[in-house]
């Protein structure tokens, strides 16, 4: 903000999924939802098979909805720096694409530096728009939402409208059973809590021996509910599913083309074909205060019929 002392924020940073991913939740000191900027979520992880760093984020503020966990970058580590890139949708024009770059540098146990930059000439020049210095204040460990909510969430006043509330029924502690088509039952649990002042829900789920992070958020810009999923399985990247509605009756269609695979291409362009390209879908058939049932189906290709893949049954513990 070009003031003498800069803008100060609190960042909660911790690992999840057995150390596979690093989560950052940013909390502005000014909590007035009408004015506060800088509240956000990011998840970063290394694809051990390719050496790529992948980052997905959701930074809602009063002027921009944050695109519901679908804001992504990818890159690599170079000379002690981690640099990730992606197509910059807000800054691009039909005549000239803009590419943004995030750089994590000067990384030690006690501090690191981040800067954000953009190029409109294919990398010949870069304009840095922000530099942030991070200093460790205390260690933070998280395995599930603490106290029923994620760090930095207070009164839920930033996204308080009805459209953002359709998935609130999943918040809480649940026992789960995943029922396979042959009748086999795999036990598990799910802990979900609000985050980002009402602009998202995050959950840690375990089904059998596999652990997952799930995020749900409504995007006013896309007019879609977005579900993000990342498992603890090595080499497996995050995925998205989208639905026009949330809650009972919602159908979340897989959107494989929405997961970033290029540092320069517009990955949002694939959302328009999600309904025809989807290889899996999740249908919320029961969404009650003490029970949720989700029917899973899959298909081989866009022309094939849907087949049953299982049913997830959640019963509330708290």
Regions found by a protein language model. Name each.
Residues 1-318:
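Hydrophobic small-molecule pocket/channel-lining residues, especially in calycin-type beta-barrels
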